[in-house]
From Swiss-Prot:
EC identifiers of the protein: 3.4.19.12
InterPro entries the UniProt entry points to: OTU_dom, Otubain, Papain-like_cys_pep_sf, Peptidase_C65_otubain, Peptidase_C65_otubain_sub1, Peptidase_C65_otubain_sub2
Catalytic activity annotation: Thiol-dependent hydrolysis of ester, thioester, amide, peptide and isopeptide bonds formed by the C-terminal Gly of ubiquitin (a 76-residue protein attached to proteins as an intracellular targeting signal)
Keyword Transport attributed: no
Keywords (A to Z) from UniProt: Hydrolase, Protease, Thiol protease, Ubl conjugation pathway
Sections of the chain in a coiled coil: none
Record function comment: Hydrolase that can remove conjugated ubiquitin from proteins and plays an important regulatory role at the level of protein turnover by preventing degradation. Specifically cleaves 'Lys-48'-linked polyubiquitin.
Similarity comment: family membership: Belongs to the peptidase C65 family.
Keyword Repeat tagged: no
Domain OTU: 76-275
Descriptive protein name: Ubiquitin thioesterase otubain-like
Lineage: Eukaryota, Metazoa, Ecdysozoa, Nematoda, Chromadorea
One Gene Ontology term from the biological process aspect of the record: proteolysis
Enzyme active site: D84, C87 (nucleophile), H244, H268
Length: 288
């Protein structure tokens, strides 16, 4: 079991060799993270989408102002996620656990999948301490959700505790890495020349505070077997040239229902939500 102390904060699942320049960059990144931590929680409260609109000025940022207004017509709420390099993974984790809090059957299946992933990681050669620390820590957390020990307010308190939240994130980083390694033949051709998949996973996926790139995003979505939609504030950022992108790829917009929807602003992801569909009430019988 992991002790919930700041000394145990994860930095990577493996040992990364760094140069002096890289250490300087890491120090600069950590300073930015510390500044961000002082300014915002890891996971914010749900807020009306009008909050997003208020961030942009019609005169100085007309394109973003227009897009924010368009989103506010489709989505009712936004949950801001701290921009610390973990925002995509954190948003996915929060969005998924929100679903599981209200879907016991899916929660039971998810726990079984997490335990299976622990075995898969061991077979892939991940260190035993990695699996016992990060995997067991996450599974214990999600089993407490299943058993009702962690209620919604407890879950969000944990998500906002640096001493525990980042251990939970490491499990998602590990299964992302594991999925890529299981499908190395499919993903290795997309890496920069001279970089092996093992190196990529160690430095870009398993290392904390690293932003998720396209390969990491696809791998996590597939590892979790979920469907997501990413809405883009910048119309030029979507891979298909549109205003949003569905994952896994190949789903038609008309039939695609995402489990989780993210908002991508340059370099950052937040969660956005549609208003729950209203249940139609039966018509009253005519008065005799």
């Amino acid at each position: 079991m992991v002790n919930d102390t700041s000394e145990n904060q994860p930095t990577t699942a493996g040992i990364v060799t760094t140069t002096e320049d890289e250490l300087i960059l890491q120090d600069q990144q950590m300073k930015r993270i510390e500044d961000e931590q002082k300014a915002s929680p890891l996971v914010g409260e749900k807020m009306p989408c009008a909050t997003l609109v208020s961030l942009y000025d019609q005169e100085t940022a007309p394109a973003f102002f227009e897009k924010a207004n368009e989103l506010a017509k489709v989505y009712s709420h936004i949950r801001f996620i701290r921009g610390d390099g973990n925002c995509f993974i954190r948003a996915i984790q929060v969005g998924l656990v929100e679903i599981l809090l209200n879907d016991k059957e899916r929660l039971v299946k998810f726990i079984a999948s997490c335990k299976e992933w622990t075995e898969r990681l061991v077979k892939l050669g991940f260190p035993d301490w990695t699996c016992t620390d990060f995997c067991e820590f996450f599974i214990e957390f999600i089993e407490k959700v299943r058993d009702g020990i962690h209620q919604k307010e407890d879950v969000f308190r944990i998500f906002n505790d640096d001493n525990t939240a980042n251990y939970l994130l490491m499990f998602f980083r590990l299964i992302t890495s594991g999925y890529l390694k299981e499908h190395a033949a499919e993903y290795e051709p997309f890496l920069d020349e001279g970089m092996s998949l093992a190196q990529y996973c160690e430095t870009e996926i398993e290392a904390m505070w690293k932003e998720s790139d396209h390969l990491g995003i696809i791998a996590l979505v597939r590892a979790l077997n979920i469907r997501i939609r990413i809405e883009y504030m910048d119309r030029n950022a979507a891979p298909n040239g549109g205003t949003h992108h569905n994952l896994p790829d190949g789903h038609d917009n008309a039939t695609f229902t995402p489990d989780i929807t993210l908002l991508y602003r340059p370099g950052h992801y937040d969660l956005i939500y549609k208003a729950p569909a209203e249940t139609s009430k039966p018509a009253l019988p005519p008065v005799a």
